[in-house]
Regions:
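Acetyl-CoA-dependent GNAT
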Residues: 12-80, 88-93, 156-158
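Short secondary-structure capping/turn micro-motifs that flank functional sites
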Residues: 41-42, 109-111, 132-133
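Conserved GNAT acetyl-CoA-binding A-motif
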Residues: 96-109
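Conserved N-terminal entry element of GNAT/NAT acetyltransferase domains
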Residues: 1-16, 142, 146-158
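Conserved catalytic-core motifs of GNAT/GCN5-like acyltransferases
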Residues: 104-106, 122-139, 151-152
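Accessory recognition modules or surfaces
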Residues: 84, 88, 135-145
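Conserved beta-strand segments that form the floor/walls of ligand-binding pockets within enzyme
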Residues: 71, 76, 102-104, 139
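Conserved glycine-rich acetyl-CoA-binding loop
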Residues: 74, 78-91, 106-114, 118-119
Length: 158
């Protein structure tokens, strides 16, 4: 059975899908103990970002909130939709617009680290006490070469 996934782009300054994104983030937080941002921080950062969204039957199932410089503030895919390539497609969408993509991931978030490393991100440095709760982070980077979009597109096709 084929499932249709619609994509949308929320431009900076918009509230479109912010509540659904918050609810998805919170569901992941409850289940996995990651994505621990406070509501005010999350919504403010969301509104200042370009947000790439995937919806299934009008329900938000994945999103990436990205700054103008290609820094991914938030990347989340519903646990029910993982393994379908949505995360890769979100990163590929970011790669279409940016030569370099960067992000932070908790040192304890093995799922995220495996995902990013599979896509070719490199850990550039560790930052102790990066998060508000004292959690440590890795700063990750992908790209800065002309073939970034092609490499990501190839991964998505796999």
């Amino acid at each position: 059975m084929s499932v249709n996934i619609d994509s949308r782009v929320v431009t900076s300054g918009s509230d479109d899908h912010v509540d659904e994104a918050w609810q998805l983030k919170e569901a992941i937080n409850r289940q996995e103990g990651v994505l621990k941002q406070r509501y005010d921080f999350f919504t403010s950062a969301y509104r200042r970002s370009t947000v790439y969204c995937y919806l299934q039957e009008d329900e938000l199932v994945g999103f990436a909130a990205v700054r103008r410089d290609g820094y991914i503030l938030f990347l989340a895919v519903s646990p029910d939709c993982r393994g379908q390539g949505l995360g890769k497609r979100l990163v590929a969408r970011v790669a279409d617009e940016h030569d370099t993509i960067t992000c932070h991931a908790r040192t304890s978030n093995e799922n995220a680290l495996q995902f990013y490393e599979h896509l070719g991100f490199e850990i550039k440095r560790r930052i102790d006490n990066y998060y508000e709760d004292g959690g440590d982070a890795y700063y990750l980077k992908l790209g800065s070469d002309a073939g970034l979009a092609d490499r990501i597109s190839e991964l998505v096709r796999r």
